[in-house]
Structure formats: structure tokens, C-alpha cells
Amino acid sequence: MEAVTAAWERYAAGRTPRRTHNAAGATTWLNWTQYADHGPDESVIGEIHGRRVLELGCGTGCNLAHLSTLGAQCVGIDIAPTQREKAAARWGHLPGLSFRTAEATEFLAAHPDSFDVVLSIFGPVWFIDPTTLLPLVRQSLTAGGAFVFSHKPPRPDPQPGEPLREARAVSRWDHSPCKWAALLESARFANITTEIIDPPHGEREGTLVVRAEAREERIGRPARQS
Ligand SMILES: C[S@@+](CC[C@H](N)C(=O)[O-])C[C@H]1O[C@@H](n2cnc3c(N)ncnc32)[C@H](O)[C@@H]1O
């Protein structure tokens, strides 16, 4: 785990802060994609006001800050301590918003049934084995709660003659929309939707956005025997 934390600390050190205003002049906004001023807004999530929202791998907290301005009670966690410091310095004045340094699986395991919405925007859902992570996300959500995440769609295998991919410091679960739907179904999610958002003009890679809801489960009583 120390090597993973160190890799994400290096990542944090190389990032430039998000702009103070977007193209529309807003000071907070939610961005699901890897491109500025592109893609759907927070309406993908569903209801926000009054909801308890957890973001896994919130980085500098800019997406979560936006949800906080819309009336959500927000907790952002990130494995890299520097990210929490930057998030708190920029957004710590907003009400109903807090940031913690925590590893996603450890945090989820300690907070069952606590959130109405769990988000991961290019976050840990991409970097943790889903057979470990999805049951923990499901357990942390209230029945009917929304789980929404985004990451790059899987790339086709390299063609003969194409350069091999670079080695990565952290593993990545580049699943297709169908594979995510199957994994979510078996982890007790329902109403699963997947969409690949087209890239902006001149770019090649789109963005996969997945939404699912924690299945409401009836615990049936055993039938009475006569
Ligand atoms: C690609 S960045 C995305 C940050 C942010 N969501 C955004 O859209 O700008 C991934 C973030 O996930 C965090 N992260 C990666 N693995 C994690 C884990 N296992 N637990 C918690 N945070 C993690 C990293 O430190 C990093 O800040």
C-alpha cells in the first residue's frame, strides 16, 4: 500500500490546479471527462440536495465542492495526503463538505449503510479490483442509492507493429460497458446504465460513464409450516 500511496503522491505533485472559472463563468462545476468544458453535468447522478455523498479519490475536491454548493452533505476521501491538504485549502470554507486521507476499501468497510450517493471520477473504481470494491460500495450505500463513476473506455489491443503500452505504477481495471454491467449486477446493483461520451472535436478517446443503484432487497420470512 505504501508504494501505491507514493505513486499517487507523485501524481498529485505533478498536477496543476483546476481553473477558478470554467468557460461558462462558473466557479464550481462537475466534470466527468478528461476534457475541460465537456460532457454531462451533475444531472447524471439524480437527486443531490440533502443527499449524503461520498467521493472516492476526490483529488483536490473540485467536483465534490460543486455538489456541496447544490445542498449535498459531502465527504471526499483520497489516499494521497497532499490531495486532502489542497482540497481543504481551496474548499474548506464550504458548509457540509469534508475531506479525509483514507484508502477507499478501508474507508468503505468502516462505513456501512452511510451514503445515498457514491462517486468515483477517474478514481479508485478504475484502480481497485472490482470483485473487492463493488461489494464494499454496495454495502456503504442506502437501498436505492446511486453509484456513478467514470474513466477512459478500454482501448483495443495493440495491432502488430504498434508500440506496446507503457508499464504502469498502479493497476487499472479497463472494463468494457458490458463487463461493468455484469459485475455490478452480481454485486447486487440494479438499473445499470453505461454510456461512452464522445470526445470533443479533434480528440480520439471518449469517456465511459456508468450509473447503477443499490438494489432494494426484501428479506423474506421463511414460510410457516403447517
Ligand atoms: C486520476 S485522479 C482523479 C482525481 C479526481 N477524482 C478528479 O477527477 O480530478 C485519481 C485519484 O484517486 C486517488 N486514489 C487512487 N487510489 C485510491 C485508493 N485506493 N483509495 C483512495 N484514493 C485513491 C488518487 O490519489 C487520485 O487523487
List each language-model region with its residue ranges:
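A short SAM/SAH-binding and catalytic strip from SAM-dependent methyltransferases
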Residues: 117-131
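A short glycine-rich, Lys/Arg-flanked "PGG" loop and its adjoining helix->strand segment in the class I
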Residues: 131-146
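Conserved S-adenosyl-L-methionine
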Residues: 189-200
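Class I SAM-dependent methyltransferase SAM/SAH-binding core
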Residues: 54, 60-106
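Conserved class I S-adenosyl-L-methionine
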Residues: 1-49, 62, 146-177
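Core SAM-dependent methyltransferase catalytic element
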Residues: 198-226
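A short acidic, Gly/Pro-enriched loop at the edge of an enzyme's catalytic core
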Residues: 109-118
